[in-house]
A protein has these predicted regions:
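Hydrophobic transmembrane helix bundles of membrane-integrated enzymes that assemble
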Residues: 1-33, 88-278, 389-481
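Non-catalytic effector/regulatory segments
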Residues: 9-40, 280-309, 316-317, 378-390
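Extracytoplasmic loop-helix module adjacent to an early transmembrane segment
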Residues: 24-100
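Alpha-helical transmembrane segments of integral membrane proteins, especially early/N-terminal helices
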Residues: 42, 75-78, 134-141, 354-363, ...
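Individual transmembrane alpha-helix segments
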Residues: 68-115, 318-332, 336, 385-394
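Membrane-proximal, non-transmembrane alpha-helical segments
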Residues: 337, 342, 346-414, 421-425, ...
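Membrane-proximal cytoplasmic C-terminal regulatory module of class A 7TM GPCRs
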Residues: 482-489
Length: 491
């Protein structure tokens, strides 16, 4: 019913067309001159040295180097060891090796962009190829085309794609999340799920969990989702593959958590305390006393770890001994559990930043493009602009959205007894859980520091939820229309 006269699944053709459209969109938006990327903001250094790359012109002014302009070209250097723990550096290093083959003098950031683009196109093709099959070829075509259009409109937005030509870890997590969910849907929709598809799911899920230390706990949930795939096939080989994959995710997540450097823990803890709990508190003395922090550190309330000219230097050994080595993030969690109203205030603060896919304070253009300092591109920014204009600005608004989504998933799960359907629904439940997790963890783990960028994964998960709602609505509408047509014919 969903095949053409040559016996080909129409979704294959639409998937390839969607992949071609995604590639053309990427080339036109970020690779064709003027090249689009994101300015550094000071984060690239922890990735470049480990990946064998370096800044090509370090003599630029601070604003030019980190905020005003993205940079198209970088230099090559030796490989250094650093405290940045992430599999993201492996991806960047591979792009660096490809870059050396193409041009041994300078690294063009478009090589990295092309690597991300290839993975993004793969995800789009997987999603569309395994879109829901309908009873007629026309209905299947419409369903696949709608899904392709929504995926390109949302995740092809310049807000996401500008990240591809930067050394931030965000695009790595985005691509991994898309591939993880796409492969999960592909597995759930297959009559005989392939081991290579499950391997892709495991690799992508592990990439998300190891993209940054804050995402590591997600690997535990991904392992549970992998285990739920045991019933997709009944043979012993499949069960061994699933159990092995779940174990890899479990162990990888635990190792990622254990690998967090002490210095990074102390930086994040400082942010959680002084730029989180104690920031804007109406009861500073009480909160400091409850946490066991001496009153002499009161001037640090509201400061971040990288701020200059604080009353007490952030690297002061006494501060480390009396505060950062004595407290832990467990104390932060306990504080917020005792003072839920304070945590709600922090969630409202997060909600004020939750709709921003990209940081608007970072320039998108290389200086050679002749654009004003800090200029950003608004080409194909319909989705990101809509979010800024229309998304909730309070935690209560997002609570309602997530509760409604959870209830809808529960209803679909109960209605469908098929194990394959339930795995697909559970995949989206994991996405929603990851979104909620990605909103809460930055507040506990890093206070209000750089909230806009730290909520990137929240945006990814929220937008995947939106795509699933739109696709689900069209699926229901097409089924209803088909039923009405059949009833008229039979009547």
């Amino acid at each position: 019913m969903i095949r053409d006269r040559a016996g080909r699944d129409i979704r294959v053709l639409i998937a390839w067309l969607a992949g071609i459209a995604a590639g053309a969109l990427l080339i036109g938006l970020i690779m064709a001159p003027p090249v689009i990327g994101l300015a550094d903001s000071g984060d690239f250094g922890r990735v470049l040295g480990v990946s064998g790359l370096r800044v090509l012109h370090p003599d630029q002014s601070y604003e030019e180097l980190y905020f005003n302009y993205a940079h198209q070209y970088f230099g090559y250097g030796g490989y250094t060891l650093g405290g940045y723990v992430s599999t993201h550096v492996v991806f960047v290093a591979i792009a660096g090796w490809i870059g050396r083959l193409l041009d041994g003098d300078v690294f063009d950031v478009r090589v990295l962009g092309a690597c991300y683009a290839a993975a993004y196109i793969w995800a789009v093709v997987l999603f569309v190829r395994h879109s829901p099959g309908m009873k007629s070829r026309t209905a299947t075509t419409i369903m696949a085309a709608v899904l392709a259009a929504v995926l390109l409109f949302v995740f092809g937005d310049i807000g996401y794609e500008a990240y591809f030509q930067s050394f931030f870890g965000e695009p790595y997590a985005l691509i991994a999340m898309l591939l993880m969910v796409a492969s999960a849907f592909a597995l759930a929709s297959s009559n005989e799920p392939a081991g290579r598809l499950f391997a892709l799911f495991v690799v992508a899920a592990l990439a998300v969990a190891t993209s940054k230390i804050q995402n590591a706990p997600l690997g535990l949930v991904f392992a549970l989702l992998a285990w739920r795939m045991t019933g997709l096939r009944r043979d012993p080989r499949w069960r061994r593959q699933v159990w092995t994959g779940a174990a890899i995710l479990l162990i990888g997540s635990i190792l990622m958590i254990a690998a967090a450097p002490d210095r990074l823990k102390h930086v994040n803890l400082y942010q959680s305390i002084f730029f989180g709990v104690l920031k804007d508190t109406p009861h500073l003395e009480r909160d400091m006393e409850e946490l066991g922090i001496a009153s002499k550190y009161a001037p640090l309330a509201g400061t971040n770890y990288f701020q200059k000219d604080t009353a007490i230097p952030q690297n002061d050994p006494v501060l480390h001994r009396e505060v950062l080595q004595r407290l832990s993030h467990k104390d932060i969690v306990l504080y917020y559990l005792k003072h839920l109203s304070r945590f709600m205030q922090k969630l409202d603060r997060a909600a004020e930043n939750a709709m921003y896919i990209r940081p608007y304070y970072l320039g998108n253009y290389d200086a050679s493009a002749g654009k004003p300092p800090g200029a950003i591109s608004h080409t194909f920014s319909g989705w990101s602009d809509f979010k800024v204009a229309a998304m909730p600005r309070s935690a209560a608004g997002y609570f309602l959205v997530f509760i409604a989504y959870a209830l809808a998933l529960a209803a679909v799960w109960r209605k469908n007894r098929s194990g394959k359907w339930r795995v697909a629904v559970e995949t989206m439940a994991v996405v929603a859980l990851a979104g909620a997790f990605s909103c809460v963890v930055p507040l506990i783990g890093d206070g209000e520091a750089d909230l806009g960028k730290h909520l990137f994964m929240f945006n990814v998960c929220f937008d995947m939820m939106v795509v699933s709602v739109i696709a689900g609505a069209f699926y229901g509408a097409i089924k209803l229309a088909g039923r009405q047509v059949r009833n008229r014919r039979n009547g």
